[in-house]
Amino acid sequence: MRTLLIDNYDSFTHNLFQYIGEATGQPPVVVPNDADWSRLPLEDFDAIVVSPGPGSPDRERDFGISRRAITDSGLPVLGVCLGHQGIAQLFGGTVGLAPEPMHGRVSEVRHTGEDVFRGLPSPFTAVRYHSLAATDLPDELEPLAWSDDGVVMGLRHREKPLWGVQFHPESIGSDFGREIMANFRDLALAHHRARRDAADSPYELHVRRVDVLPDAEEVRRGCLPGEGATFWLDSSSVLEGASRFSFLGDDRGPLAEYLTYRVADGVVSVRGSDGTTTRTRRPFFSYLEEQLERRRVPVAPDLPFEFNLGYVGYLGYELKAETTGDPAHRSPHPDAAFLFADRAIALDHQEGCCYLLALDRRGHDDGARAWLRETAETLTGLAVRVPAEPTPAMVFGVPEAAAGFGPLARARHDKDAYLKRIDECLKEIRNGESYEICLTNMVTAPTEATALPLYSALRAISPVPYGALLEFPELSVLSASPERFLTIGADGGVESKPIKGTRPRGGTAEEDERLRADLAGREKDRAENLMIVDLVRNDLNSVCAIGSVHVPRLFEVETYAPVHQLVSTIRGRLRPGTSTAACVRAAFPGGSMTGAPKKRTMEIIDRLEEGPRGVYSGALGWFALSGAADLSIVIRTIVLADGRAEFGVGGAIVSLSDQEEEFTETVVKARAMVTALDGSAVAGAR
């Protein structure tokens, strides 16, 4: 492996030189940071190491071409000390004074066990030479290691092959310097293997950037005729680190497929773009795993997201029969339904542009290029149009007699019956059968609403980071979910953000803040959330590398239009050889919709709820050809089918639960759906 070593005029660069040479088997090529970047033969190198040095990364004299190496080379980069600080600063972090100067001083470094720290004990001893430190890392940079004084000692970019260490691994006083260099070598080689895999794939991804950003609903109406199967994964609320992109597409491409699966049959049914249907008897997750491997296409380096086309759809709750549950109830809808998308439009709400993605077989790209050209012209035309004002939701709602939970709407369990089931949950908890039971109720009503206008109303009422509109032949799914089930990177990084704990928004700023503070501090809500955090940690620990699962954020309050929510974040890294489908299978259904212990609690739920949940409380999103995935929990979601609307509501029952409060919480959670359907707030259930 050939390595370029950029010397920031440091006195330890050739100590790094030796460690790099030992790890790679070849001496690196050393160039000073004031070399001519344009004359460097980057095609001759496999990786770059940016050395320590004096000064600050924001000064040209101190950092020079190190900046270009990080931002422009496209190669795996390891930044050491000053190089580490440069990565942080170039992606929006802050570099300022460290708590105290640390020159030639030894610290213990604690780490996650990932990437450059793979296989190393935590803590280990390292030597530090720095007065500055990286702080306030942006979400695209992930800290991997820390010293006891709280300074970030290691980081990585979530999408690019960039790593940094603040300490000096080459120092004679540092432990495991050679191992860190060997780990970087392995990461660089793995990156290049993934790129070479693209040449082996039977498919080729074509990408075009269009520097306009039309209104998302205008794109849905103007680019997708609405026939067949369509999807709109909608970041109607753009939150840093959670939602930046929306994706739209349909089944008109030459490689598109629409597949459904029902647990009772055990058969995957696939309708191709030519109208023919094939049926395969195979467990769903096994089928999905095989197809993703067969069709694997590495992430395009010029895309700022990991969705490079693939499967878009939902996993219904009753699919639990193929993970950790029993086939107690049969859903009227497919237990899984996905569109294999070979064309998609991505809206970048942060940069104000679009990306067009088209997949074709190698050597047969005329259709893809024509679609890119035509769609770019359509988007440019849509960008000059003023988006229409959303039509009030009540125009499309259920008949007036069914307003709220009126006489034409039917809850599976009325208030008295639901309260009795809460009491049953409390008895099961008192008897030691469960710690937490996520009890839910299903509500149905006749409706004349159609999917797109109704979803337009729902997204206006409740903008969220994980919204979605799936218009499939059997049903339409309209989701205003605020909850991330799992996001899985092509590099194996995993994140889950379960929600447990809800309060309504207040009528005044003072009341709103009081409700928010009550949610943040109430023991009952924290207990609910904590138990699900531990459950999700357990699920991820079954498929993640030892020591990689951690909780960077615990009990954070997130605020949305209708409610405040208590959210925690769990992260990990998949064990080598573990597929994306295997990770989802290990965690499905999401613990925030079951309770704990999961298997026994789902048995209790099956008995008390007396019917299927269907799409509700499953998962919705995409599995990409890159090996990445992003799935939300299906909550705050309306399902339209056969002239009826249905949605689920519920809450976690714990020993501290109050029955009336739990019922009221279901009413609060229903507000967005009911308001979209009939234009009025929920007054109560009958």
UniProtKB/Swiss-Prot annotation:
Residues 2-194 form the Glutamine amidotransferase type-1 domain. Keywords: Antibiotic biosynthesis, Glutamine amidotransferase, Multifunctional enzyme, Transferase. The active site is at 81 (nucleophile), 168, 170. It comes from Streptomyces venezuelae (strain ATCC 10712 / CBS 650.69 / DSM 40230 / JCM 4526 / NBRC 13096 / PD 04745). CDD domains: GATase1_Anthranilate_Synthase. Involved in chloramphenicol biosynthesis. Catalyzes the biosynthesis of 4-amino-4-deoxychorismate (ADC) from chorismate and glutamine. It catalyses: chorismate + L-glutamine = 4-amino-4-deoxychorismate + L-glutamate. InterPro entries: ADC_synth_comp_1, ADC_synthase, Anth_synth_I-like, Anth_synth_I_N, Chorismate_C, Class_I_gatase-like, GATASE, TrpG/PapA_dom. PROSITE patterns: GATASE_TYPE_1. Its EC number is 2.6.1.85. The gene is cmlB. Pathway: Antibiotic biosynthesis. It holds the Pfam family Anth_synt_I_N. GO terms for molecular function: 4-amino-4-deoxychorismate synthase activity. PANTHER family: AMINOBENZOATE/ANTHRANILATE SYNTHASE (PTHR11236), AMINODEOXYCHORISMATE SYNTHASE (PTHR11236:SF18). This is Aminodeoxychorismate synthase. Disruption phenotype: Disruption of the gene decreases sulfanilamide resistance and blocks chloramphenicol production. It is an enzyme of class 2 (transferase).
